A protein has these predicted regions:
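Accessory, non-catalytic peripheral segments of nucleic-acid enzymes
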Residues: 176-307
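Charged helix-capping and loop-helix junction motifs
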Residues: 15-22, 115-123, 235-236
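N-terminal active-site segment of His-dependent metallophosphoesterases
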Residues: 1-20, 97, 292-307
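Conserved catalytic scaffold of divalent metal-dependent phosphoesterases
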Residues: 40-122, 155-156, 184, 197
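Active-site glycine-centered loops adjacent to acidic/histidine catalytic or metal-binding residues
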Residues: 6-7, 37-38, 106, 135-136, ...
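A short helix->loop->beta-strand "cap" motif at the edges of active sites that frequently abuts
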Residues: 28-32, 99, 129, 147-148
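Conserved beta-sheet core of the metallophosphoesterase superfamily
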Residues: 114-177
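Core catalytic region of metal-dependent phosphoesterases/phosphodiesterases
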Residues: 1-66
Length: 307
């Protein structure tokens, strides 16, 4: 069976997106159970009410957990009826049935007072379920509470640069024990990266990217001291990465020794530092150079950025 714990649609949906989801669900040819979440909650205008769904699909449309029996298992599920929902697992315990007891909810285990169907360890323990499939949390995770395994896959694909890394699904096997494993999907991924430009911005960007282009989404922030960058020209160097965004947060290079020789406190200070730069050992020279850079940044009223 396939369990989908909500948010297939992100609020509004189009005819094309409905038809694509319909065809995909019909093609799997196994029972599919859906628990609508806070983004695609059940309402008089939601696709769960207004549209037809394949015969192999069961959509839970009540805020109270209800059951659907199939061969070897009973599946319990509920739905959001608004953008927020109370704890739908509170006070629930599965009735003794033949086979496995499986639950599916769009719920949040991270906050006891979450407005998105908070799920607590105590509720999981008392549920009488063998397995509880959750949605809502976009990072994959799992916890065993008593006799119940509770797990969530995250999301099959990130939707922005706050959802980086591997995304995928969970495969759960029910037997004498219940086991779960995360399976990454070959969907485009998001990467939010940063690099110091130094003298070669092309090399700085290239070291963060794979050799061959792909459809992944890269946002690379360029930092450090640099002459003015031509981002358009730099972007063209990496045209084989169509989803690459470059952000310029470099600062103009500043000579930390520019005050040497001035008849001022500042000039005297940097002159003394420079004497250490020329007369000390390599460690003293490193410290003197670093002190000059930091001092220059502070005196110029800028943010301290270590070289």
């Amino acid at each position: 069976m396939m369990l989908i714990s909500g948010d297939i649609f992100d609020r509004a949906y189009s005819r094309e997106s409905y038809q694509a989801v319909y065809r995909a669900l019909e093609s799997v040819q196994v029972p599919v159970f859906i628990s609508p979440g806070n983004h695609d909650y059940v309402s008089m205008t939601s696709p769960w009410v207004t549209e037809k769904w394949p015969a192999n699909v069961t959509v839970f449309t009540r805020e109270k957990l209800t059951k659907k029996q199939i061969s070897g298992a009973t599946v319990w599920g509920a739905a959001f009826l608004a953008p927020e929902a109370p704890s739908l697992l509170e006070g629930f315990r599965a009735e003794p049935e033949e086979g496995f007891a499986i639950g599916i909810l769009h719920g949040d285990t991270t906050q006891a007072k979450s407005p998105y169907c908070p799920v607590t360890a105590g509720q999981i323990r008392e549920s009488g379920l063998h397995y509880l499939a959750l949605g809502h949390i976009h990072e994959a995770g799992a916890l065993q509470v008593g006799d119940t395994l509770c797990a969530w896959p995250g999301c099959p694909m990130g939707t922005g640069y706050d959802e980086t890394g591997e995304k995928g699904v969970r495969i759960v096997e029910l037997g004498q024990t219940v086991t779960s494993r995360f399976v990454p999907l070959n969907t485009p991924r998001f990467y939010d990266l940063e690099t110091t430009v130094a003298d070669d911005p092309v090399a700085a960007v290239a070291k963060l990217l794979p050799a061959a282009g792909n459809q992944d989404f890269y946002r690379i922030t360029l930092t450090g001291a640099s002459e003015a960058l031509d981002l358009s020209k730099l972007q063209n160097k990496f045209s084989h990465f169509p989803n690459l965004i470059l952000r310029d947060q470099t600062v103009p290079p500043v000579d930390p020794w520019q005050a040497v020789g001035e008849d001022s406190f500042e000039g005297t200070y940097f002159t003394l530092l420079q004497e250490n730069l020329h007369s000390g050992d390599s460690e003293q020279q490193r410290i003197a150079q670093l002190a000059a850079v930091i001092s220059r940044q502070l005196l110029d009223g800028g943010e301290v950025k270590l070289p």
